[in-house]
UniProtKB/Swiss-Prot annotation:
Catalytic reaction list: chlorophyllide a + oxidized 2[4Fe-4S]-[ferredoxin] + 2 ADP + 2 phosphate = protochlorophyllide a + reduced 2[4Fe-4S]-[ferredoxin] + 2 ATP + 2 H2O
HAMAP family: ChlL_BchL
Gene Ontology molecular function: any one: oxidoreductase activity, acting on the CH-CH group of donors, iron-sulfur protein as acceptor
Assembly and oligomerization: Homodimer. Protochlorophyllide reductase is composed of three subunits; BchL, BchN and BchB.
The keyword Iron-sulfur is assigned to this record: yes
Protein name: Light-independent protochlorophyllide reductase iron-sulfur ATP-binding protein
Binding site for ATP: 43-48, 72, 213-214, 237-239
UniProt similarity note: Belongs to the NifH/BchL/ChlL family.
Pathway: Porphyrin-containing compound metabolism; bacteriochlorophyll biosynthesis (light-independent)
The gene coding this protein: bchL
Length: 299
């Protein structure tokens, strides 16, 4: 029987009225590595941020695993230089007999030794993406691929905050939110904060802070953070070099040493050091929708 044929067990109401979540088997807990889950509005640059952060951790000498949790499976392509097959694709090829898989079938080495996995997802409108993430972690555990890893980064689909795509929060120590200095991005961040706060009642995950990405200024992000008790822990400016790195299928650490590129690399290294050394667990108070409109100057 396919591991995806069985409906995932769910718990209702444990972290908010009407909440439905995928239950984590304690044996699937990731131990020994620091685990980060990256969220943000769709199209905000989570994959770019995750990949460059993975590269930065590797530059610090850490053994890194990045897990893409989006059916688009493009999370790791700047690390590997290609769109690698997903765990779900590989399982389909062996009729979901996971015991037939070898690590090299679904784990691919990227820039500076970063290990890359794309979980993939079920067809649109079917299945549970969170369950797919669980099966991916299960495979990694079965093949002992997490034992020699210092850092695990989950790059999570868009700003979806359902129980299924909150599944990486079950494994994460800290959640990081990628945002920009505009209303839509901050609005999405506010919703993600509410979701993480709800899940943290049952899981050990806590918020680490936010990254202002593709933003010349950070005034709106900083104003929001000050209001709710959150922290901006990095600022990645809106550089054409970042866009070009995506087109070249490379991380920023492989681009030419232009002054602006060097500065952004330093910011990623600083972010990696901050996360590795540990951040204070944050408990911001998300705002009602109307208050966000008022805060950011909308009538």
């Amino acid at each position: 029987m396919s591991p995806l044929d069985t409906a995932p067990p769910v718990l209702k109401g444990e972290d908010g009225e009407g909440s439905v979540q995928v239950h984590q088997d304690d044996s699937m807990k990731i131990e020994g590595a620091k685990v980060f889950s990256v969220y943000g509005k769709g199209g905000i640059g989570k994959s770019t941020t995750s990949s460059n952060l993975s590269a930065a951790f590797s530059k610090l000498g850490k053994r890194v695993l990045q897990i893409g949790c989006d059916p688009k499976h493009d999370s790791t392509f700047t690390l590997t230089g290609s769109l690698v097959p997903t765990v779900i694709d590989i399982l389909k090829e062996v009729d979901f007999h996971a015991e037939e898989l070898r690590p090299e079938d679904f784990v691919f080495e990227g820039f500076n030794g970063v290990k890359c996995v794309e979980a993939g997802g079920p067809p649109a409108g079917t299945g549970c993406g969170g369950y797919v993430v669980g099966q991916t972690v299960k495979l990694l555990k079965q093949h002992h691929l997490l034992e020699d890893t210092d850092v695990v980064i989950f790059d999570v689909l868009g700003d979806v905050v359902c129980g299924g795509f909150a599944a990486p929060l079950q494994h994460a120590d800290r959640a990081l939110i990628v945002t920009a200095n505009d209303f839509d991005s901050i609005y999405a961040m506010n919703r993600i904060i509410a979701a993480v706060q709800a899940k943290s009642k049952n899981y050990s995950v806590r918020l680490a802070g936010c990254v202002a990405n593709r933003s010349r200024e950070t005034d709106e992000v900083d104003r929001y953070c000050k209001t709710v008790g959150f922290n901006r822990i990095a600022h990645m400016p809106d550089l054409d070099a970042i866009r070009r790195s995506r087109l070249k299928k490379k991380t920023l650490f492989e681009m030419e040493d232009a002054e602006d590129v060097v500065q952004v690399r330093k910011e990623y290294i600083r972010l990696a050091e901050t996360l590795w050394n540990g951040t204070e667990p944050l408990a911001p108070a998300p705002l009602p929708d109307r208050e966000i409109f008022e805060l950011l100057g909308f009538d």
